[in-house]
Amino acid sequence: MSNYDALYRQLAAMGQERWAEQLQATLPDKLALESTAKMAGWQSAMQSLPEISPSRIELLDTVTIGSSDDLGQVDREELMAHLQAFHPWRKGPYNFFGIEIDTEWRSDWKWERLLPHIQPLAGRRVIDVGCGNGYHGWRMRGAGAEFVLGIEPFLLSVQQFQVMQRYLCDPQHHVIPIGIEEVPPNLACFDSVFSMGVLYHRRSPLDHLFELKGCLRPGGELILETLIVEGDRETIFMPPGRYAKMRNVWFIPSIAAMTLWLERCGFTDIACVDTNRTSREEQRSTEWMRFESLADFLDPDDAQKTIEGHPAPLRAIFTATKP
């Protein structure tokens, strides 16, 4: 596991000494939650990564680390094999020393949709809830964010972040293996809070909104992306079983209902800034994610429905302010 000493110092400088102490006591134990065989494989792959310095780093328009000229052909083939040890790669894409890591999601498309609508990130402290492997965190740093903390309970995603961090060596971007429920309430120290693709997995969506609000300083901005359904303020869809083969989808609101939830939780300046029906081009199986993907989750005869007959995934991005 990464050495988080820089993170502890940064949190203490933000007035969060107690949280830094809690993390220092609990993060080392998180590794025990993953099987020894999996962790051993990841650690072996991590240790086998080449000791080279990237000739270029690009985070503004892409996430590009190094170039193909930094490696010989044999080293590149070995690097690709080591990267595949961290399969499946879900969030990206990354250009890694000339290797195109074509992830399941075109997360860059989502970033392009939301960036024009949010407060400028330059100089801001950001927490990204359910951040996956930290792809959007790198884009936030590229957009000028001063400090980015990603929280992600799945250790494989954290390990993928560490692969990139090994070469980017960015002391202002961290991903730690915790969930939002482990974040102390009412921190009130972040300028921007991102929660993308998380809300519908929460059994209590309003509690999740209050948790996000507690992370924000007064005047801070929430950026929330979630599944939605068409309807009015009283329309909330609760799947009777699976949704798009997912077991853990609980509540999918309409835009109007989501707006009402945000109002009831005390947010202001609420806006739905984007809606997008997920396409097979944006979410699909690739060489880097060889399991089922969106095409397998939809009705083969009607792409407007999931395999269970529910409305196909429609996503919306909301922005709101903590007064």
UniProtKB/Swiss-Prot annotation:
Residue sites binding carboxy-S-adenosyl-L-methionine per the record: K91, W105, K110, G130, I180, E181, M196, Y200, R315
Keyword check for Transferase: yes
Molecular function GO labels: methyltransferase activity; transferase activity, transferring alkyl or aryl (other than methyl) groups
GO biological process terms, semicolon-separated: tRNA wobble uridine modification
Catalysis: reaction(s): carboxy-S-adenosyl-L-methionine + 5-hydroxyuridine(34) in tRNA = 5-carboxymethoxyuridine(34) in tRNA + S-adenosyl-L-homocysteine + H(+)
EC number: 2.5.1.-
Transmembrane parts of this sequence: none
Superkingdom, taxonomy of origin: Bacteria
Top EC class, one word: transferase
Keywords: Transferase, tRNA processing
Presence of the UniProt keyword tRNA processing in the record: yes
Record note on quaternary structure: Homotetramer.
Similarity remark: Belongs to the class I-like SAM-binding methyltransferase superfamily. CmoB family.
Record's function text: Catalyzes carboxymethyl transfer from carboxy-S-adenosyl-L-methionine (Cx-SAM) to 5-hydroxyuridine (ho5U) to form 5-carboxymethoxyuridine (cmo5U) at position 34 in tRNAs.
Name the record gives this protein: tRNA U34 carboxymethyltransferase
Species for this entry: Citrifermentans bemidjiense (strain ATCC BAA-1014 / DSM 16622 / JCM 12645 / Bem)
Primary gene name: cmoB
